[in-house]
Amino acid sequence: MDQPISVRTNLVSGQGSLRDAAEIVDGRVFLITDPGIVAAGHVARLEDIFAAKQIACHRFDAVTSNPSEADVDTCRAALQSAYGDSGADWLVALGGGSCIDVAKGCSTLAASGGRMRDYLGHQPTAQEQAPVLAIPTTAGTGSEVQSFALITNDDTGRKMACGGEAPAVAILDPDLTRSQPPFVAACSGLDTLAHAVETAVTNVRTTASLHYAHEAWRLVERNFEPSLRQPDDLNARSAMLRASAAAGIAIENSMLGAAHSMANPLTTHFDIVHGQAVGQMLPFVVRFNAENK
């Protein structure tokens, strides 16, 4: 149970920390986001921050929920169109877990080629990848600190955990989560809660991963409801971002469980939001485990 913890992502947190993005990246930047984040005004803010530092930035803003291999392929083609074979020096993911997963997948394909299915369950061969700066606008997936990307197989519809590099840096700015609709915030929080529970009880947990699972649970227990009831409570929103990252680190160093496995078909076949699906399955899994010790 005692194994060294692996934390591959440097965390920058605090209100207004989005402005630190221009101090982190340099050279050619490729920004990956979605239409909702554009509409919320976050993309314009970040582009202005880059422009003030004369940082070249091209944008891809067509990420969809529950991204597929085709989504990553389209993003990779946009990167090629923007910067040619030289590629980008940094990929910046601004959005929820879908945007971050597409960015990680795009970085992998740009360096190693192929399709996402080629990296199902394992890391790509040693090729230098463009680093990813993850800037989550939801507090839930933990993708900002994980090396695997959750991508849908175009042929089977199954979710694939595809190996790659974890983001080099993640910015946790609670200002960015205020634009979340209440339903999105609730589903994201349920995802973090499920991550904390499942990583705490998995058979492959370690002492270190259990520490992060417990920290995530502590933060969720104290801040989930306040973050929903008082959307402008930036302390609660910041705590939920930290909870998401802590649970993500626990996942990276252990495993998830049946609630996530059972949720994936719901998202694939019924287009249910990931956090909602996990939240619906978790009580049944907890009850089953309690009755079958």
What are the roles of these predicted feature ranges?
Residues N10, V29-F30, H58, D89-V92, ...:
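Structural motif
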Residues T9, A111-T207, N292:
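A glycine/threonine-rich phosphate-anchoring loop and its flanking beta-alpha core
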Residues T199-K293:
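Active-site segments that bind and position negatively charged phosphate/pyrophosphate groups
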Residues Q15, A39-H42, E69, S98-K104, ...:
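Short glycine/serine/threonine-rich phosphate/pyrophosphate-binding segments
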Residues L46, T74-R76, C99-S112, V145-Q146:
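Short Gly/Thr/Asp-enriched flexible loops that form oxyanion-binding sites at enzyme active sites
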